[in-house]
Amino acid sequence: MKKIYSILFLLSLTGLFGQPPRSLNTDLEFVFEHPLLLHRLDSLSLNIGEEASVLIRLVDSKGNQVKTTFMIRGQRKAIVAEPRRSDTTGVAKVTVKALDSGELNLRAMAIGKKGRTVGALKVNVPLVPLEKITFVAPIQKVFVGTSVNYSVKVFDKAKRIRRNTNVVFTSSNNKVAEFDNFGNLTINKTGKTTITATVDDIDESLVVSAKKNPARKIKFDISENQVRTGDVIKLNATVLDGRDKVLDNIPITFSYSGQAIHQTDNFINNRSTESVGLPASGLITQNGKFVAETPGIYTLTAQSSGFSASKKVKVVPRNVRKRLEVVGHGTISNVNTSDLWVWPGVGKHKGKDFAVTGTHSADGEAYFWDISDPANMEIIDTIKVDARTVNDVKISEDGRVGVISREGASNRKNGLVILDVTDPFNVSIINEYNDDLTGGVHNVFIYEDHIYALSAGRRYDIINISDPANPFRVGSYELNSPGHSIHDVWVENGIAYSSNWSDGVHVVDVGGIKQSEKSRAKNQFNPFLALAGKGSPGNPIKLGSKEDPNGHNHAAFPFQSESTNKFYIITGDEWAKAVPGSPERIFQGGFHFVDFTDVKNPVETAIYQVPEVGSHNHWVKGDTLFAGYYYGGIRVVDISGELMGNLYAQGREIAFFKGEDPNGTTPNITNVWGVIPYKGLIYFADLNNGLWAVRLVDNAPLGTN
């Protein structure tokens, strides 16, 4: 066993606001005080743009100050708090700035061996008066017999978009055109009307001209007559005039109806043998696409100008179900397991296979495994460092250099440790790198002689390890948005994909080789490579991004669909609902499929979400998603074809498995952290019980009683 240090202390708080549930330590509490008067604050009132200072102390039940560091966070994109970490005396003088209105929170959190201590100060920020309304891409020429939707943006005097306002739409001449309650304007007759959007005491108006409708019929066809659940159908509809001329400016609406069937029913003469109580469920879009969630006979309808046309489609079960069979399991019962990595041996160990797993809220250990015989995997070496948590572990492409992250070091030097893993039976420490990383390194990645390391949840630093014994920083990437925070970074083909909570995914050129669109291989084209070529590890250049409206962006993985000419980034959530009166939290969230085929206009088209559990990390191989789902175990999902709607409801889940172990740190409960497909098997790390290897096998035929 190799050691750097052995003294253990409180866990660094870099990633605490997104960690697994643990017990509350009620022996300690946070006190929020006025920095000059030193009286206790029950709340704080600020206007947008204003700042105030708050003194935060961590004390025991007798009011004595506890000398340890803790983390401070403002509500994302609403409150900025600086600094984000206290000093070692257990005190922080924090400058708080309000960016949004509402009943907000300034939060503090510390983690110790007895559990976590949390505290919050209410920050009340009043609403700013509204200033203006603007129509979004308004249509001013409309046609009788059609319906047009209007939307607006509402701005306040702080120049911010105000959401969740009650905007009322009215028409000055309802005989010409009339609004419903949802911003849809129905055109009744030719003429002019002034439409007005009103909220509170401000409004905006627009003159709309209603013209005679030249439409005389609608032509409608669909791309397929029989599909599986989850397959996207293209709806081809055109409006024609009396001379069969196509009218491009006449709106078309699409709808569906249908009858669901049992998964095992047979179709007879295009009718199911028995209907069920389930609805014929699916998703239809107004740009002409449909996908079904349940098998059945569906009627798809295109309507415009009083004309309609329909087509029927048969939807059959997707039938991708398999099962996961255990190949091997290495139990870790004394500490919690964090992430994993697997790789092929090199040199004298060529032909063998190895894995490394980290540890969470433990003693700073990383375990190295021989998995050459997956059924008999075993720990062959251990590295121990000064840390409570070794959250992340990575191995270089050539299988010779490893890196492990550190959080909770006793000397507050929470950097990273560089390892020689050429001989996994005798792993040695090459060096450690702590420069400006003392706030804790939560996640790391190795790509082409560089380590990408998260620094205190603020940015990722890029560290050259061409000589692993002498690492040095060459660059960094940090967002400039207020209160920004980062959780993870992944690098592939010289493009870095970082996950930044509410700021979403950022795509950065760190050495991508520029690729010509003309020379691209069909179905294997990353459009960001067409933009790359100017960035490097020392000069990272942003290529694109997409915000996360829910603020839960925890991980990201690029996905070049093998079955379509589309490029997605699959972003993963991590968030949890508090249970009133309990230290436990209910994890929620899933994986969002963002179509970046047009890098300037990314669109989320699909989601995979298991209703009762929450997501963690994921991996893609081919057209298959492998997902770690905390208490939901490991999930394997078919992501072939165009992706749209609710993938879970569409029957795309191939298999799931819960690795329950009576000898785990929490007996008989799974808590899957990370997952990697490798050489026909699927390896995953379970927080509660160690390392697993499973494989997909066909479902056994059902017998009879």
Positions of the model-derived regions?
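Feature marking well-ordered beta-strand scaffolds used for ligand recognition
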Residues: 217, 221-224, 264-271, 281-705
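Intrinsically disordered, low-complexity segments enriched in glycine/proline and serine/threonine
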Residues: 5-6, 159, 207, 464, ...
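Generic N-terminal simple sequence motifs
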Residues: 16-17, 31, 79, 467, ...
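Residues marking helix boundaries in flexible regions
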Residues: 5-8, 80, 196, 514
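Extracytoplasmic soluble-region selector
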Residues: 20-321
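Residues in and immediately flanking transmembrane alpha helices
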Residues: 15-16, 169, 254, 699, ...
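Bacterial Sec-dependent N-terminal signal peptides
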Residues: 1-22
